[in-house]
């Protein structure tokens, strides 16, 4: 019994004294005590100034780009500074709740949970005895009473604002607007942030029923500024990876950083996913081993084939008609001449699927370009795999050199025999020739090798 107590005591000491090793995070918000990370506030400057000016604002960025991490950082910083009460509120549970009679009470419950469990409001209650039958005004009344009871101004950052739609969205914004315009006389929220994937201009597209019009007093006009959370720069990728080097001694050369940045273009989830795959899977956490550009290529291929949720959620969007209308001309290399105010065009940009680079619409990074092509041509490739044609790469190699004439001759014959049937299989029918070619080439390199594709917008080439 005595030995057991000593053992327990030792275990307790070891457990409490052990520092968790930091790692590259690819799931959920980042925590500076657990994860290697770049502070998100540096990628979205000017928020503090908007809060000081009592403004309501929007931050939008693609999924897994650091939005929630930014909000949690900001809430902690504001509360630590002591000038404001800052509250984080996720609206994710409101997904699909269109009816404001159900949606507004749910928003109030989310706020109540955040207030209760934060521990920052021990002597103040929120929405006690709230009249939920008055769903067109209960949110405003609850926030007004709460703000009146506080000694400091209240800042609320609403995450996952995209989850609101139709009646719930209108009732939510209208009550914020009503409180906003009268707050010089009646207490209300000092500053509000609405954070999601979309710019607020596109929230109007989520109002489907004609009777739910915005009217002349649009609730959207309370927003002073719309901001986005940019991707990492190459220098920030280097700084992020250097944190791992400082702890482990494992070095990332300039060539490795260049390769990672080229493949990811600084998209935060991809930047973390590539290095995590290299460090933990390819090199098996052996920090004595050097990281090479070849490891980057290997990690990228694994991520493409594995199709994590981050990749899969983007690929599911390709089925949407509004996405197809924008993406298909990019695949076929046509000069589309997009209207930069077109909702579908802006939707694709907001999702992070495409970027406008010097007036040319392109996939946001080579990884996205590759997964888009492979997704759209996957059925064709599987059919080729089962038929055994075309043969894999060795059949086209002569003394280690690719026999282009034989390869193209086989493709021409394949096209003559199959193109009419196969084109009907594609969702993106205009891009079918390009997709069949990519599937053909992917089948050829299955036994080893890679294809590097460039989408030549405006030149009708791949």
Where are these regions (language model features)?
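The catalytic "switch" region of P-loop NTPases
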Residues: 28-29, 168-263, 277, 281-285, ...
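A short, highly charged nucleic-acid-interacting micro-segment common to nuclease
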Residues: 165-166, 397-398, 417-435
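Winged-helix-like regulatory helical subdomains adjacent to P-loop NTPase cores
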Residues: 235-238, 242-351, 357-358, 386-390
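Active-site metal-binding core of divalent-cation-utilizing nuclease and nuclease-like domains
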Residues: 440-462
């Amino acid at each position: 019994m005595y030995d057991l107590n000593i053992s327990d005591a030792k275990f307790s000491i070891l457990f409490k004294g052990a520092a968790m090793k930091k790692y590259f995070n690819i799931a959920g918000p980042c925590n500076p005590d657990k994860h290697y990370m770049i502070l998100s506030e540096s990628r979205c400057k000017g928020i503090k100034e908007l809060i000081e000016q009592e403004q309501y604002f929007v931050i939008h960025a693609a999924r897994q780009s650091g939005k929630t991490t930014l909000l949690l950082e900001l809430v902690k910083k504001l509360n630590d500074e002591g000038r404001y009460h800052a509250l984080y509120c996720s609206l994710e549970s409101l997904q699909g709740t269109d009816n404001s009679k159900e949606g507004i009470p749910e928003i109030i419950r989310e706020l109540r949970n955040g207030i209760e469990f934060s521990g920052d409001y021990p002597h103040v209650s929120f929405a006690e005895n709230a009249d939920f039958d008055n769903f067109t005004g209960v949110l405003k009344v609850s926030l007004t009473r709460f703000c009146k009871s506080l000694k400091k101004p209240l800042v609320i950052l609403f995450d996952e604002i995209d989850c609101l739609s139709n009646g719930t969205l209108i009732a939510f914004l209208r009550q914020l607007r009503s409180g906003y315009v009268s707050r010089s006389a009646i207490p209300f929220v000092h500053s509000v942030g609405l954070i999601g994937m979309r710019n607020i201009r596109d929230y109007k597209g989520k109002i489907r029923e004609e009777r739910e019009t915005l009217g002349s007093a649009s609730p959207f006009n309370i927003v002073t500024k719309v901001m986005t959370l940019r991707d990492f720069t190459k220098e920030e990728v280097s700084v992020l990876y250097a944190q791992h080097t400082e702890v482990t001694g494992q070095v990332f050369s300039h060539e490795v950083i260049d390769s990672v940045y080229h493949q990811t273009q600084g998209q935060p989830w991809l930047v973390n996913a590539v290095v995590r795959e290299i460090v933990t899977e390819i090199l098996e956490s052996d920090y004595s081993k050097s990281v090479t550009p070849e490891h980057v290529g290997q990690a990228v291929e694994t991520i493409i084939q594995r199709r994590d949720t981050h990749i899969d959620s983007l690929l599911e969007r390709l089925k949407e008609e509004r996405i197809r209308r924008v993406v298909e001309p990019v695949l076929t290399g046509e000069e589309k001449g997009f209207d930069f105010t077109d909702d579908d065009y802006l939707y694709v940009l907001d999702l992070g699927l495409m970027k406008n680079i010097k007036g040319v619409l392109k996939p946001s990074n080579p990884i996205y370009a590759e997964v888009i092509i492979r997704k759209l041509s996957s059925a064709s490739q599987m059919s080729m795999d089962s038929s055994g044609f075309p043969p894999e790469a060795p059949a086209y190699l002569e003394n280690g050199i690719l026999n282009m004439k034989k390869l193209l001759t086989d493709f021409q014959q394949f096209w003559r025999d199959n193109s009419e049937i196969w084109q009907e299989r594609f969702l993106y029918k205009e891009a079918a020739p390009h997709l069949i070619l990519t599937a053909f080439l992917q089948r050829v390199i299955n036994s080893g090798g890679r294809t590097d594709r460039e989408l030549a917008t405006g030149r009708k080439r791949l």
